[in-house]
């Protein structure tokens, strides 16, 4: 049986002040871990508010001991994170000595919504989602996936949709972003999907979380994107994949 280790580390660029002591001149590294990396372990624990599986708190404690200072969640479902209410999840993470920084979650548009351009029902879902993330102490909500649209019109609709989500996040003191994989570098009606998204979303409402591995896997240069679109990448994700392992979307 092959054991597969996937590590996604969220580098909290410009998110947390760097602490420097005048006496030692040592810089404190602020690095958050994406909990999707340990999903197989977390998914086995049985958490309920009022009763918490000891294995769950042990995992958080071990991550903190390894040097991680914050977490990015990836399990928002029915108003909870890992079967814990937003406030309880925040308490769990902080009790382990880390901060709740971000969360991967999204709601894609249906064929009907894309055809009509009316995504008001999805926005109702987002209203509750944003409220739950705010209660959990999140600073960022990041959409981790969208399929390649069939038409440029559909991609334009998604950009408008993301702008509206981002606007609503801003109103609640959060920021909304998008996390890439490699498929965003495909073309839609002659235009690179990722570039189109960067150019048709409002920087005031939408930032991008660059996954360096997937940019390179998509045969592009992360540095080129940083230079071409300054200020759009607020956080950076580093995905680790061993050479002998097959690609998985992380």
Show where each model-derived region lies.
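Active-site acidic/histidine proton-transfer and metal-coordination neighborhood
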Residues: 92, 99, 110-207
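Conserved small/polar residues in nucleotide/adenosyl-binding loops
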Residues: 239-246
């Amino acid at each position: 049986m092959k054991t597969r280790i996937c590590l996604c580390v969220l580098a909290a660029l410009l998110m947390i002040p760097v602490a420097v002591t005048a006496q030692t001149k040592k810089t404190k590294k602020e690095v958050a871990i994406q909990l999707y990396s340990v999903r197989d372990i977390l998914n086995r624990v049985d958490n309920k508010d009022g009763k918490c599986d000891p294995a769950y708190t042990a995992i958080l404690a071990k991550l903190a001991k390894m040097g991680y200072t914050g977490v990015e969640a990836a399990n928002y479902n029915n108003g909870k994170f890992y079967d814990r209410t937003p406030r309880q999840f925040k308490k769990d993470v902080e009790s382990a000595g880390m901060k709740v920084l971000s969360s991967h979650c999204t709601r894609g548009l249906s064929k009907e919504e894309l055809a009509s351009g009316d995504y008001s029902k999805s926005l109702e879902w987002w209203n509750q989602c944003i409220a739950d993330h705010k209660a959990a102490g999140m600073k960022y909500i990041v959409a981790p996936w969208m399929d390649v649209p069939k038409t440029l019109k559909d991609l334009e609709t998604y950009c408008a949709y993301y702008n509206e989500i981002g606007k609503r996040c801003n109103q609640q003191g959060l920021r909304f972003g998008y996390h890439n994989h490699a498929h965003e570098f495909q073309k839609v009606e002659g235009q690179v999907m990722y570039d189109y998204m960067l150019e048709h979303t409002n920087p005031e409402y939408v930032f991008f979380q660059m996954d360096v591995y997937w940019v390179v896997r998509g045969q592009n240069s992360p540095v080129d994107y940083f230079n071409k679109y300054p200020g759009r990448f607020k956080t950076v994700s580093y995905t680790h994949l061993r050479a002998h392992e097959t690609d998985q979307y992380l």
